[in-house]
């Protein structure tokens, strides 16, 4: 016999935990399921922009200062550098710092907050069956639950999404991929003649190594996140060899690429209508990842918040949750994904012409591009979309 809940959320990462937090605060009975025990490691560069911190403050009451003090954020930097291979396109300081986190710590913090708000969590057992029509969700061990509403927040390989009639071929066509590893600062391989960026206290991104993608070096408190990511269809099996080239450029052993981990990444295959019957999809499960730089944490947090609010409306006012959810996505998320994909096509196509097109674009955009990345301005023609932090502007040199 199945146990009935108002809402079952599959996936306890940022999207699922945020939806659970919103619903539990409203007194809704929420069951949060995840195949992993928490804390667990998650492959992610772990960079948060201002817009992500804004959601954390609104939903959880967390501030950047408080998260840094508690160790949930491990470092912050207003600085940045953008390179086309060795040549610097731009460097400077943003009006607001980038914050860095380890997903093992960050996701556990959000889950703990949702449970403290009243959500029930069942961890360590995979969901193997979902019926969007009846709201039945079954675990690998055979235990079943029935829900009035299901939120699928179970990542890029979502079991919930695959139970719905979405176009699997289109999803696969738009997939990206990433390879990444962490290198502790005390690793002896950093003591030799390595690239200066490996000792920089700010994040650096690199064009020119992939036709449709980029590389990165992000500084955390105790280690560096080093990786590449891009469109799988264009690069496929080249990823590892391109990663070796990138590591050689940084002065690191090429064989580090062979020990690195890879994962799929939504890269333009977002679902414009991520719902079916009793199901709403959020975060990576719906492909809601920014399609230029691959930023995913903000879109997971915001779509989780929107999904939670939409289901709460459905339970209290009897509305179809797809209506408020779709409205929120069309207002806050989908335009950013559409226009970042347009920008990606232009910028990646221009890489074949070398350094100059990217240099002119970044230098011409200046302060406005910094506001776009942090979410104060939209990818849609750089229109203003939020008030942002008190100070505005960024220095570019």
Residue positions per predicted region:
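Glycine-rich phosphate/pyrophosphate-binding beta-alpha loops
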Residues: 46, 97-100, 214, 286-298
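FAD/FMN-dependent oxidoreductases across multiple families
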Residues: 129, 144, 234-310, 315, ...
